[in-house]
Amino acid sequence: MKTTPDALAALIGQRVDLIDTPALVVDLDAMDRNIQRMADFARKHQVRWRPHAKMHKSAELALLLQQAGAQGVCVQKVSEAEALAAGGVRDIAITNEVIAMPKLHRAARLATALASRGGRLGVAVDSAEGIERLAEAMAQSGSDAGMDVLVEIDVGQGRCGVPPGEPAVALALAVARHPRLRFAGLQA
């Protein structure tokens, strides 16, 4: 899969002194070893893993991680989810709350597109308002596709999320009341 213009194509095997800067240089052998170590660890401990793509923003790397056993990929923004989906990634979780209706409509369209390819999109929420706005965007999409919803738990930093316990349960129940939203778990 090629997603870059010819001038920006990967230069695998190129001598470092011939590479124009700025450039990302990756030791492919070390990357493969690290991916395999993480996959082996997850299998040994019987855990599902979903790496974050906020640093590499690479569909190719996300697909390699999924081939090694990652459940999917995490991103911070709708635009990052759209870019990875365009590169072939089909299981994406947006780990930040999305509140603006234009972005929620984009997320709803993306959820529909991913569902049509056997994929799924998830979004984090930490308020009843966020759930209602997400449900509204999904309803307005005109699609029967659903969206996974993760209730974000505040881990004590006071940045985002709801306290554990009753507030989290209340949000999970609020998600369950909407036909196109699926409670997919907690995020902390």
State the predicted function of each range.
Residues 1-5:
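N-terminal hydrophobic targeting/anchoring segments and the immediately downstream early-domain regions
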Residues 6-8, 187-188:
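Mobile beta-alpha loop/short-helix "lid" or hinge segments that flank ligand
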Residues 7-11, 30-61, 74-76:
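N-terminal glycine-rich anion-binding loops that anchor highly charged ligand groups
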Residues 7-26:
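Generic N-terminal amphipathic, Lys/Arg-enriched alpha-helix
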Residues 19-21, 46, 118-120:
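Short, solvent-exposed beta-strand edge segments and adjacent coil->beta transition regions
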Residues 26-29, 122:
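Short, surface-exposed alpha-helical recognition segments that flank or form part
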Residues 52-188:
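Active-site-proximal beta-alpha core segment in soluble small-molecule metabolic enzymes
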